Amino acid sequence: ENNKKMALISKNTEKIAVERHYEDSAQIISYLDKNDKTILDIGSGAGLPGIILDIIKKDHNLEFSTHLVDKSPKKVKFLKSVNSFLDLDLKIHNCDVKMMIKKDFTTLVSRAFKPMKEFFEIIIDSKITFEKIILMKGEKFMDEYNDAKKYFEINCEYYDSITNPSSKLFVIKGVSKI
């Protein structure tokens, strides 16, 4: 019902939501550790991957606070209702990520938000500090990565997605403008 009103996930993937969205989001947990204290899910939309990570963190002996940021009031209203319904302790920010100026997070995560180049520009211009970024990228990941490398020095590794062999998870330890 909410998806019809707010376009939280693609209509093409509603029937396979568990595999396509939840399992896809959950795989990030393998790249988190006890040093990850504050996670910011940028462009959270339907709460993916942030809500899923928050739900499963205890099963992986992890403790972190989860922040979700989205500029859409409708999506934020949905996120707040999920937070309340599931009795989670999410910090939900209704603003453009550019407004998170000079905030400190240990880990930034994002799924289906912006191309890498634009993502890095936003993070650097906003002076958001981080130790690690985990980006979930689809089939055009190499085009995005190669484009971003023209403008940024990127210290990263990338891994195959467990839900789609054409997708990758980028674990980024540092990024700076060239």
Show the residue positions of the predicted features.
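Conserved SAM-binding strand-loop segment of SAM-dependent methyltransferases
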Residues: 86-97
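Conserved SAM-binding loop of SAM-dependent methyltransferases across substrates and taxa
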Residues: 46-62
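Conserved SAM-binding motif I beta-strand of class I
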Residues: 65-70
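Conserved beta-strand signature within the Rossmann-like core of class I S-adenosyl-L-methionine
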Residues: 130-141
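Active-site capping/gating segments
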Residues: 140-178
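Conserved S-adenosyl-L-methionine
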Residues: 41-45
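A short acidic, Gly/Pro-enriched loop at the edge of an enzyme's catalytic core
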Residues: 100-107
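Class I SAM-dependent transferase core
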Residues: 1-36, 40, 74-77, 81-86
